[in-house]
Design a protein with these regions (language model features):
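N-terminal glycine/serine-rich phosphate-binding loop of ATP-dependent small-molecule kinases
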Residues: 1-97, 125, 231-240, 428-432, ...
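Carbohydrate-associated surface elements
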Residues: 104
């Protein structure tokens, strides 16, 4: 009898549920978008109740459309947008404020004060991160300091804090389980990646009561079961929740990057390059960060990571704000209609620059416009910008890693773009390997849950499931690529520190 694993893939713009069989094949899926809330420039929020409602609806629909007996679902795994932060009432399960999203830059002044206080080295030594508004710690502090009554309620033990994994597990278990996994915890700026515990000194420095925080747990073990009487999920009551990982380490796991030195890039709302660095964390000297990749069977694997904030979101900007395209695939068609971007460079620093620059005050820039620039050139420049940013990350990674990268595995929505993948291979001078199963993030969560319940017996078995769909090899002249990349770096300089004096 076939056995299935359900993965909840809670992303920045939509909530998805995917059902996998033992061969790693997709049996059913469902997806629902939710609102993006922008209260002020540089601020990004989500409604936590919309996150829960859309994820619950997606799970129910995926199971229903599969036409299977829900009792054949062995486990549920969760993967999620990381760093996005929620505070909620422990008794009612109601959020006290909207979720503050990973892209939100409202806490940049808090980060500046922490850096001025000399906390930077301590943060890096203990957490593997840099002080930046990207991470959850300053988001929790902002909520405590700015939402009336929240600090007092937190100190009385009435509230819970967590990233989206914690929120979903809490809701799925009917408020019985308040946990997070090591990979999500390691993105808070509060978690010691050496001891795998919340760091008391860092919590004190940020004024965060430790009783707010969820219990950190390994990535592949039982956390709880789906509660009875959840509207729409009654048939799933009792199914164990056994796997959890942030979206990027889940993709690294789903890509079967189990050997140190293997790396992947996910082309989603942002771009995220992760390399497996093995059992010991690597301290970056090139503007990258180190996080927990996963902890399975008592063994913790660390990942070196570079993150850029705007990739697929730049294509959405072309569609939704500029109206230059009607659908995302039109960006490819436009870009393919011209041989290059015509000297146009776009730096999509809409919410600052991530790795390796870490500039909270950078803003988006378009340079090189002339009267002959067309919307096709703009579309090509958008795809180029995504590839340039990943090139920045891989170059930094090669500076830090014990040995240079030899192949980049890719996934995420924009990885279906042949023109983008070819541009990426040209700029990196490396093979770019696109898998047959592009839903690697969701499969990573399913794999972690399936390992915990015996659906898959080993990581070697999971590795055999990964197949390549296409490998892109460098084709363009190397010297021309080098000139293009140098121009990109010039454009980046023009975007730096753009609004520093305005905050």
């Amino acid at each position: 009898m076939e056995t299935y694993v359900a993965a909840l893939d809670q992303g920045t713009t939509s909530s998805r549920a995917i059902l996998f069989n033992r061969a790693g094949e997709i049996v059913a899926r469902a997806q629902y978008p939710f609102r993006q809330i922008y209260p002020q420039p540089g601020w990004v929020e989500h409604d936590p109740m919309e996150i829960w409602a859309t994820e619950k609806r997606a799970l129910a629909e995926a199971v229903d459309s599969a036409h299977i007996d829900p009792k054949r679902i062995a486990a549920v795994g969760i993967t999620n947008q990381r760093e996005t932060t929620i505070l909620w009432d422990r008794a009612t399960g109601q959020p006290v404020y909207n979720a503050i999203v990973w892209q939100c830059r409202r806490t940049a002044p808090i980060c500046d004060r922490l850096a001025a206080d000399g906390l930077g080295e301590t943060v890096t030594d203990k957490t593997g991160l840099l002080i930046d508004a990207y991470f959850s710690g300053t988001k929790i502090k902002w909520l405590l300091d700015n939402v009336p009554g929240v600090r007092e309620r937190a100190e009385r033990g009435e509230l819970c804090a967590g990233t989206v994994d914690s929120w979903l597990i809490w809701q799925l278990t009917g408020g019985c389980v308040h946990v997070t996994d090591y990979s999500n915890a390691s993105r808070t700026m509060l978690f010691n990646i050496h001891t795998l515990q919340w760091d008391e000194d860092l919590c004190h420095a940020l004024g965060i009561p430790m009783q707010l925080l969820p219990e950190p747990r390994p990535n592949s073990e039982p956390y709880g079961v789906i509660a009875e009487n959840i509207p729409g999920l009654e048939a799933l009551a009792g199914i164990p929740i056994c796997g959890s990982a942030g979206d990027q380490p889940a993709a690294l796991f789903g890509q079967a990057c189990f050997t140190p030195g293997q790396a992947k890039n996910t082309y989603g709302t942002g771009c995220f390059t992760l390399m497996n660095v093995g059992a010991e964390p690597v301290r970056s000297k090139a503007g990258l960060v180190t996080s927990v990749g996963w902890s399975v069977n008592g063994r913790t694997t660390y990942a070196l990571e570079g993150s850029v904030f705007n990739a697929g979101s730049t294509i959405q900007w072309l569609r939704d704000e500029l109206g230059l395209i009607g659908t995302a695939p039109e960006c490819d068609r436009l870009a393919e209609s011209v041989p290059d971007a015509g000297g146009v460079y776009i730096v999509p620093a809409f919410t600052g620059l991530g790795a390796p620059y870490w500039d909270m005050y950078a803003r988006g820039t378009i340079v090189g416009l002339t009267r002959v620039t067309t919307k096709a050139h703009i579309a090509r420049a958008v795809l180029d910008a995504i590839a340039f940013q990943v090139t920045d990350l891989v170059r930094a990674m090669n500076d830090d890693a014990p040995c240079p990268l030899t192949t980049l595995r890719v996934d995420g929505g924009a990885s279906v773009s042949d023109i983008l993948m070819q541009t990426q291979a040209d700029l990196l001078r490396l093979p770019v390997d696109r898998p047959a199963q592009v839903e690697t993030t969701a499969f990573g969560a399913a794999a972690l849950a399936g390992l915990a319940t015996g659906v898959w017996g080993s990581m070697e078995e999971l590795e055999r499931l990964r197949l390549s769909q296409h490998v892109f090899l460098p084709r363009r002249d190397e010297a021309a690529c080098a000139v293009d990349y140098a121009q990109w770096r010039r454009a980046v300089k023009r975007s730096r520190s753009w609004i520093e004096n305005e905050l």
